[in-house]
Amino acid sequence: MKKTIVIAIAGLSLAIAGCASSPNLDESFSDIGANADLKGVLFADRTHDYGDVDITIFEGRLMLTGTMNTEEGRRKLIENAWKANGVDQVIDEILIADGTSLGQGFEDTRIDTTLRAKLIADGDVKAGSFKTSVSRGVVYIIGVTPSERQLNAALDIARSIGGVEKVVSHMLVRPL
């Protein structure tokens, strides 16, 4: 029981720390709520398989990546995404295809982990100003950066990682 409580507190601490790195704490909590809303709706919907869909939200902009088996499922996913509280924009990067293979899933995880580590280590990039998702070797980046220089630095880092097929940016440049 104590172990469960400690793990829950540690998880909550990490979530709050992640929120604190965002430019706007209220938007971070709103993003967490929107993410939970949408995941709850998708979990309850047994008509489509959403197992290969990644949901990434940043300041009310919800990015959907991954694969769906049917166009009907993709449309339903987008419809549900707009219903989540706090969502101002839905970015559809869903591919209609068979689900990602186990090997490709491991490769995507390796790319994502490498990218996050390199972004955190880079002095020119503020890692808390964006989020990433990787699907089938394609890196998707969403967030806000204060300059084109920081944006280009982040994109160059993503492109430099072995196994990356393409980098898709949904970044906004918003000077301080």
What is the role of each PLM region?
Residues K2-L176:
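N-terminal targeting leaders
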